[in-house]
């Protein structure tokens, strides 16, 4: 999965997919009542990027729905996965469940079109704080009470705080999560970070007792760091330059081992060689 980083304006969806992304990451900020409010990152952000592009969250969802609904004039067949980077740092810990419920209702109405031929992309809820695990249970409760528990089939999870792998496993246990797990690891492109924890995550993914289904690394903008991440065995790379990742995937060393995921590749299934 080539994951376009910080896609917060509707116009950027086309831009990143046209550069080669089959997945996008979008920031979600919350108001003081735990309603998802804007797709907005803010300052500071990655080096070389404008930090302040934004939409109202529900409007972004409508644009995203068009981009992922077959038959729509804005449809992109290859856009198959969306990561919502949930900026829950502005919330109290006890608001996490509410944030999940409100997020689910927004998605149900504006993205999934109340279960009637909505957008088809798989969704990853990426949460920065392990203490906010109730966002997951709240999200699930809301979809169930709204009569659409089947949409949970399209939803996966990530804790993005670079926490100890064992602590992450524990948070999922508390949230009752037993699958659909992406594990992110990384740092802003302004700084360097080694691949030690990525290797631990990959080892967990590939062990019979692991909880991780997919591992992605962020934010990778250079060819050599792309090669290093692929050599470590990641499933996804988040980038400001999808074309760079696509170029490396075309190199003879990687062409035989990797390909760009399509809609038929289940993002919740661990890839077995």
From Swiss-Prot:
Compartments, record wording: Secreted
Residues that bind Mg(2+): 25, 27, 85
Family that this chain belongs to: Belongs to the arthropod phospholipase D family. Class II subfamily.
Principal localisation: secreted
Free-text tissue specificity from the UniProt record: Expressed by the venom gland.
Enzyme Commission number, as recorded: 4.6.1.-
Enzyme kind, highest EC tier: lyase
Primary role: Dermonecrotic toxins cleave the phosphodiester linkage between the phosphate and headgroup of certain phospholipids (sphingolipid and lysolipid substrates), forming an alcohol (often choline) and a cyclic phosphate. This toxin acts on sphingomyelin (SM). It may also act on ceramide phosphoethanolamine (CPE), lysophosphatidylcholine (LPC) and lysophosphatidylethanolamine (LPE), but not on lysophosphatidylserine (LPS), and lysophosphatidylglycerol (LPG). It acts by transphosphatidylation, releasing exclusively cyclic phosphate products as second products.
Catalytic activity: an N-(acyl)-sphingosylphosphocholine = an N-(acyl)-sphingosyl-1,3-cyclic phosphate + choline; an N-(acyl)-sphingosylphosphoethanolamine = an N-(acyl)-sphingosyl-1,3-cyclic phosphate + ethanolamine; a 1-acyl-sn-glycero-3-phosphocholine = a 1-acyl-sn-glycero-2,3-cyclic phosphate + choline; a 1-acyl-sn-glycero-3-phosphoethanolamine = a 1-acyl-sn-glycero-2,3-cyclic phosphate + ethanolamine
Cofactor note: Binds 1 Mg(2+) ion per subunit.
GO cellular component: extracellular region
Alphabetized InterPro entries for the sequence: PLC-like_Pdiesterase_TIM-brl
The entry's keywords: Cytolysis, Dermonecrotic toxin, Disulfide bond, Glycoprotein, Hemolysis, Lipid degradation, Lipid metabolism, Lyase, Magnesium, Metal-binding, Secreted, Toxin
Active-site residue list: 5, 41 (nucleophile)
GO MF term (any one): lyase activity
SS bond list: 45-51, 47-190
One GO biological process term: lipid catabolic process
Protein name: Dermonecrotic toxin LapSicTox-alphaIB1aii
Named cofactor requirement(s): Mg(2+)
Sugar-modified residues: 250
């Amino acid at each position: 999965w080539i994951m376009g980083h910080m896609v917060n304006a509707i116009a950027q969806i086309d831009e990143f997919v046209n550069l080669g992304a089959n997945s996008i990451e979008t920031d979600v900020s919350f108001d003081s009542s735990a309603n998802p409010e804007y797709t907005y990152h803010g300052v500071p952000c990655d080096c070389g990027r404008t930090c302040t592009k934004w939409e109202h969250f529900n409007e972004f969802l409508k644009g995203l729905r068009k981009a992922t609904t077959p038959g729509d004039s804005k449809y992109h067949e290859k856009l198959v996965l969306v990561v919502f980077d949930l900026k829950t740092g502005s919330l109290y810990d006890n608001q996490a469940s509410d944030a999940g419920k409100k997020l689910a209702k927004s998605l149900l109405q504006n993205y999934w079109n109340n279960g009637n031929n909505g957008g088809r992309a798989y969704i990853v809820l990426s949460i920065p704080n392990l203490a906010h695990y109730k966002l997951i249970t709240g999200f699930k409760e809301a979809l169930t009470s709204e009569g659409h528990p089947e949409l949970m089939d399209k939803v996966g999870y990530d804790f993005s705080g670079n926490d100890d792998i064992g602590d992450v496993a524990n948070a999922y246990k508390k949230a009752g999560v037993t699958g659909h797990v992406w594990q992110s690891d990384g740092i802003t492109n302004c700084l360097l970070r080694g691949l030690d924890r990525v290797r631990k995550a990959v080892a967990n993914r590939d062990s019979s007792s692991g909880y991780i289904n997919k591992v992605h690394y962020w934010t990778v903008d250079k060819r050599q760091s792309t090669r290093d991440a692929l050599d470590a065995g990641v499933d996804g790379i988040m980038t400001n330059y999808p074309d760079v990742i696509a170029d490396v995937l075309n190199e003879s060393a990687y062409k035989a081992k990797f390909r760009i995921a399509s809609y038929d590749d289940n993002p919740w299934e661990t890839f077995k060689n």
